[in-house]
Amino acid sequence: MKLKLVLPVLALAAAGAAFWPAAGGAATFKGIVVAKQHGTLLVTSPSGVVRAMSGRAAVGSRVAVSGRTVNVIGHAHTALVRGIVVRRVGTTMFLSSNRHLLAIHNARRLAGTATSTTAPQPGAVVETQVSVDNGDLEEQDEQEVGQANSSSIQVQATVSAVGVGTVTLNVQGQTLTVNLPGGLTLPASLVGQTVTISLSLDDNQGDDQNGDSSDESGGGGDD
């Protein structure tokens, strides 16, 4: 997977990371917290679309959001997530929903190659039913429902490391290392910053179980 564009000028301060509209009198939005990072909650709606907002709640919490106020109203053991498959490495799938990256695990993929070869590939739009356990998401069921309209997508992610020609993103404690165009090296000052980047959906890193060539130059890392 190649990083097509990095936009460091869009590094997001944590205080500005709430993307849910804050208009007065806004309708209440209800959903389930599926991830959190740096004071930002990722909340999936009943239709599976993930939204980001500032607040405090445990992963798995059922929340009601009105404006910028987040209230915990219960707890869920399962949730629905709809998004685009970005990459698979081992038993981890990286999914982009509404530009937000999620790391979803599936230990069942260790059982054999038949499962991994038939799994939806990068660029596929999927609806995934996940269980929530100790802050992690475990895939229970996955249905491919379409394909992305573009060969690249924009995502928001936190930079955990930079290397010569690579950048490593932190996705709920899992790392995703991708190539930079033309051997570009980013400044170390971006580490810990949340940035908006454009990722190619070409699955060419050579480090997963989807038939990639091991000769491909890729900053392989755990996704």
Regions from the language model: what does each represent?
Residues 2-223:
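Short, flexible, surface-exposed loop segments at domain boundaries
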